[in-house]
Amino acid sequence: MGNTNPPHILDIRRSKFEESIPKQVEAGLLSSPKTLPALLFYSTEGIQHWNRHSHAPDFYPRHEEIQILKEQATDMAASIADGSVVVDLGSASLDKVIHLLEALEAAQKKVTYYALDLSFSELTSTLQAIPTEQFIHVQFSALHGTFEDGLHWLKETPVIQDQPHCLLLFGLTIGNFSRPNAAAFLRNIASQALTGSPSQSSILLTLDSCKVPTKVTRAYTAEGVVPFALESLRYANTLFPQDGEERVFDPHDWHFLSEWNYILGRHEASLIPQSRDIKLGSPLDRIVVAKHEKIRFGCSYKYDCGERKELFESAGLHDVKIWSKEGCDVAFYQLKCCPN
């Protein structure tokens, strides 16, 4: 008989991240070049828009990840130690990870899968979509918080400290960081989550090697991306104190810009004014965004072989296993701490 009890959601937030976003928005808009923080894009509605965008036919990263998982999840499951705590750092795409979970169940691996997300409602819907009654060996739970909250929880929770840990970073998550910050983030994961049982603990992540501008820009301008981008402005308006009818942003004043940066090997997503200089609403009314000025909100770095090697070495990690498929630019990498 499978799991019958509904999975439990643990609130591991050490502070409410929503409270810090307005300060991050203001700081980003006062910097040069102007930016918006990533947290602004992960409201419940923002995540739903992203999921619709990532399911578009031209959005190759998701389709390639699923192809590889369908064909090679059994081998991936074999690489995860029995008794592991599996933490999915960003659990919005259940349709991907379900292939790995089913392979772990088939292998009779006694693991606990924790979905981590910023959105409580998205966590709830993710867990409700898992057919838990079909699983006996795999247990399910969830963590409500940020990446940092999740790593702190792994390190400081006595009952799981010394168990093997497997951190999932699907969806090209690591590509959203600058190259130095990506290495620092992986190094932080290693120091907080892989040290309790280092020989059996690992990170399982995806990276994209595609540097063909037409393929990349077609993917990142696929259906659904404009509502995703503009939803961030609506969400921002809810986080700032209201002054009558005035709002900080009017989403109708902005449009989405997609560019490939040849020098840095990354896709860049920005919002720019539609037709004129824009003075923001109170309390950011001292900020003016010029007509052709970009507010960058996202980058997706692509990694060739040399850049991957440098990333892993800088993080103090080495790849022990690679899962790829002919014709796919996305691949899965299992990383472990370098032996001392």
From Swiss-Prot:
- Is this entry keyworded ATP-binding? no
Q: Which Gene3D superfamilies match?
A: Vaccinia Virus protein VP39
Q: Which GO terms describe its biological process?
A: indole alkaloid biosynthetic process; methylation
Pfam families, per this entry? Methyltransf_33
The family this protein is said to belong to: Belongs to the methyltransferase superfamily.
Describe the subunit structure. Homodimer.
> What is this protein identified as?
4-dimethylallyltryptophan N-methyltransferase easF
**Upper taxonomic lineage:** Eukaryota, Fungi, Dikarya, Ascomycota, Pezizomycotina
Q: Which gene encodes it?
A: easF
